[in-house]
């Protein structure tokens, strides 16, 4: 199940132009990954919203086609309209289409899992996952739609470091409230990540999430977009010693991102210039 942060207090805050029922409906939709089944009680636990509110909103979302009912379990899944929205966004951006061949090549080269994601509030949601061909290497078993914590992985830290200053300040405040006693340790990781990014252009993590998994990550902001995306290569820590991440893996991932950016610029349609009238 996707990691999710309870934010009922945020949904109840009065803000200019905020439509609360819409915000709550979107909060429910954000709990789902593709193919995942959730019941109303699970959605109550994930969102912190009242049971009656969840029931009313899910019923509406089913009628509109944004959710659908699984006939066997009677639980809910993403509907065709949600999946269609995602396809439309990615077609417009074109990033995944261009990035995937580069990600597959890097995954095969190092025998590691390569992922692409973007920040979703206090986590990073994976958009694309490329695994190595050998089943023996499947230690990092994440799927598209998985949410990863911001402050505990190279993926999350790179996303945070590459975010606009205003967004970064809001996210850091959210993390401070969310993490409580663990905030000081997280803040130190964030500060080290900033220093590392300035020095190397990428961020590494060793044995993150309490597992024997390490990773290296690089962020990018596509032309014409304010949304930072992050590319991440991860695998067993014994295959990713720090010396190798510094000498080979980090620079290779950084070069891959530069190649993707160059290809996106080349694929960008020419700007129409209106001739001046004489």
Swiss-Prot record:
Residues within the DNA-binding region(s): 40-59
Phenotype seen when the gene is deleted: When both copies are inactivated, the mutants are unable to grow with TSA, but show normal growth with TCA. Growth with PSB is slightly faster than growth of the wild-type strain.
Keyword terms of this UniProt record: DNA-binding, Plasmid, Transcription, Transcription regulation
One GO biological process term: negative regulation of DNA-templated transcription
Upregulating conditions: Induced by p-toluenesulfonate (TSA), p-toluenecarboxylate (TCA) and p-sulfobenzoate (PSB).
SUPFAM superfamilies per UniProt: GAF domain-like, Winged helix' DNA-binding domain
Domain IclR-ED residues, every copy: 95-266
Xref: InterPro entries: GAF-like_dom_sf (IPR029016), HTH_MetabolicPath_Reg (IPR050707), Tscrpt_reg_IclR_C (IPR014757), Tscrpt_reg_IclR_N (IPR005471), WH-like_DNA-bd_sf (IPR036388), WH_DNA-bd_sf (IPR036390)
Domain HTH iclR-type, residue spans: 19-80
A GO molecular-function annotation: DNA-binding transcription factor activity
Coiled coil regions, renumbered to chain: none
Known role: Both copies function as additional regulators for the tsa locus, specifically for tsaT.
Protein name as annotated: HTH-type transcriptional regulator TsaQ1/TsaQ2
Species per Swiss-Prot/TrEMBL record: Comamonas testosteroni (Pseudomonas testosteroni)
Native organism taxonomy: Bacteria, Pseudomonadati, Pseudomonadota, Betaproteobacteria, Burkholderiales
């Amino acid at each position: 199940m996707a990691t999710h942060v309870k934010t009922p207090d945020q949904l109840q805050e009065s803000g200019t132009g905020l439509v609360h029922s819409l915000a709550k409906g979107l909060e429910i939709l954000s709990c789902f990954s593709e193919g995942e089944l959730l019941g109303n009680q699970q959605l109550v636990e994930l969102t912190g919203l009242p049971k009656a509110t969840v029931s009313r909103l899910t019923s509406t979302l089913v009628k509109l086609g944004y959710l659908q009912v699984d006939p066997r379990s009677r639980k809910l899944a993403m509907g065709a309209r949600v999946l269609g929205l995602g396809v439309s966004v990615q077609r417009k951006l074109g990033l995944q289409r261009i990035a995937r061949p580069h990600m597959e090549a890097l995954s095969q080269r190092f025998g590691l899992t390569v992922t692409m994601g973007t920040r979703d509030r206090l986590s990073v949601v994976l958009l694309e996952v490329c695994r190595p061909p050998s089943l023996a290497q499947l230690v990092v078993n994440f799927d598209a739609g998985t949410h990863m914590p911001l402050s505990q992985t190279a993926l999350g830290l790179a996303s945070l470091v590459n975010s606009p200053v205003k967004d970064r300040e809001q996210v850091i405040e959210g993390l401070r409230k969310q993490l409580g006693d663990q905030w000081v340790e997280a803040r130190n990781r964030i500060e080290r990540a900033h220093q590392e990014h300035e020095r190397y252009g990428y961020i590494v993590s060793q044995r993150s999430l309490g597992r024997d998994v390490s990773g290296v990550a690089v962020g990018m902001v596509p032309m014409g977009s304010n949304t930072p995306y992050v590319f991440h290569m991860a695998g067993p820590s014994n295959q990713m010693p720090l010396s190798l991440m510094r000498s080979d893996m980090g620079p290779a991932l950084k070069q891959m991102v530069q190649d993707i950016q160059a290809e996106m610029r080349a694929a960008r349609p020419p700007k129409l210039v209106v001739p001046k009238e004489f």
